[in-house]
């Protein structure tokens, strides 16, 4: 029996099984089997010549972040790439115009953001149809995904693309599950949860059965939140990508205001017309917000800060002085003594800080060496 047939068999059995407390154990085992078969299906061709990425797909990462345009053929991805970056991608009114991966660069707020126009996705991509597998594989390397939808048929396309990406282990606008999973040499499967958690979807028997399906017989599993069977399987698989996503509703000039108001309820969405250049500024602002980039200006001793060439790094807890130094050159941190920081992250201007200080957008930093 082929993998595709095995997957179909498991999916059929899941469809026949009623979802209730009595069947949750059985469904958990079926979901684990399904995840295993799908992984094998996706990884299978990588051992042979069929796994070749194809012309234009081996695009080296450039700039401060990478953004991928994913959508069905002829939804306006190539036009959007041209309008945002000035990079020319062949545009026509028929499907499958783009056959390779076209890179461009957005220069925005001092940052260089690589934008990839990927070939149009088709249903069944996760199962290897068309070039969808290659498209989604590149999507896994992106810091942000823009799903471009045609305003005339947005919800149908949205559902299909989400299913294809999910089948390839890409989780959109989600955080990694709060589960600690650690294999060990002996002691069996130990399942526990933190005191503030009352698990309703995972119990010890289900966890043990799923682990047995993966031939894992010794492990510690700690729930730090109320997680689902699917989330536990994601943790065991260990190859899931959690990436922010913006739904770009293109060709809004072809629908009425009333229809646009209805579509406004879609979360994480921006309406545009790439052809008429409507609302592209709002899209750029949203891209900047979702990438969580910050600009840090360098200040040589005795000189004014360099406002023309900011150092662009990811914001949040990762945006430490050490990250800032390593972004410039990894030798700086070895000679680091302290930093003087001006800006919203400083308690007073300037503040003397160590390498663990977390920076904010548009901070000014002067490095003092040993």
Curated annotation (Swiss-Prot):
Gene3D superfamilies given in the database record: 3.10.20.30, 6.10.140.1070
One annotated Gene Ontology cellular component of this protein: cytoplasm
CDD domains membership: DRG, TGS_DRG1
InterPro entries in alphabetical order: Beta-grasp_dom_sf, DRG, G_OBG, GTP-bd, GTP-binding_2, GTP1-OBG_CS, P-loop_NTPase, Small_GTP-bd
Keyword field: GTP-binding, Nucleotide-binding
Molecular function per GO: GTP binding; GTPase activity
Residues the entry annotates as binding GTP: 71-78, 117-121, 250-253
Residues covered by the OBG-type G domain: 65-292
Gene Ontology biological process terms in this record: cytoplasmic translation
Start and end residues of each TGS domain: 292-369
Family: Belongs to the TRAFAC class OBG-HflX-like GTPase superfamily. OBG GTPase family.
Protein name (database record): Developmentally-regulated GTP-binding protein 1 homolog
Species whose genome carries this gene: Dictyostelium discoideum
Lineage of the organism: Eukaryota, Amoebozoa, Evosea, Eumycetozoa, Dictyostelia
């Amino acid at each position: 029996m082929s993998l595709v047939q095995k997957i179909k068999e498991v999916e059929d059995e899941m469809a026949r099984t009623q979802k209730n407390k009595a069947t949750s154990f059985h469904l958990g085992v079926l979901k684990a089997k399904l995840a295993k078969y799908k992984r094998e299906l996706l990884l299978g061709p990588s051992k042979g010549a069929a796994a070749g990425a194809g012309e234009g797909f081996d695009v080296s990462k450039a700039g401060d972040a990478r953004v991928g345009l994913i959508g069905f053929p002829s939804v306006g991805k190539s036009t959007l790439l041209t309008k945002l970056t000035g990079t020319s991608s062949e545009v026509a009114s028929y499907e499958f115009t783009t056959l390779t991966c076209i890179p461009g660069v957005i220069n925005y707020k001092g940052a260089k953001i690589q934008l990839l126009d990927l070939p149009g996705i088709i249903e069944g991509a996760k199962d290897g149809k068309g070039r969808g597998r290659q498209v989604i594989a590149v999507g896994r390397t992106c810091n942000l995904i823009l799903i471009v939808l045609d305003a005339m048929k947005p919800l149908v396309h949205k559902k299909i693309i989400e299913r294809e990406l999910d089948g390839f282990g890409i989780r959109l606008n989600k955080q990694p599950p709060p589960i600690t999973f650690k294999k060990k040499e002996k002691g069996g499967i130990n399942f526990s949860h933190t005191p503030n958690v009352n698990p309703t979807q995972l119990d010890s028997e289900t966890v043990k059965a799923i682990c047995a399906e993966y031939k894992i017989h010794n492990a510690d599993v700690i729930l730090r939140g109320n997680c689902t069977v699917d989330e536990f399987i994601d943790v065991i698989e260990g190859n899931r990508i959690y990436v922010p996503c913006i739904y770009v509703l293109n060709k809004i000039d072809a629908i009425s205001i009333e229809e646009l108001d209805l579509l406004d309820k879609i979360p994480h969405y921006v309406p545009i017309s790439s052809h008429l250049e409507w609302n592209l500024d709002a899209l750029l602002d949203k891209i900047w917000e979702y990438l969580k980039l910050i600009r840090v200006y360098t200040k040589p001793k005795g000189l004014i800060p360099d406002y023309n060439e900011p150092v662009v790094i990811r914001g949040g807890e990762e945006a430490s002085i050490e990250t800032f130094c390593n972004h410039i050159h990894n030798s700086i941190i070895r000679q680091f003594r302290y930093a003087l920081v001006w800006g919203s992250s400083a308690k007073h201007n300037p503040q003397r800080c160590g390498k663990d200080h977390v920076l904010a957008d548009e901070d000014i930093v002067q490095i003092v060496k040993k």
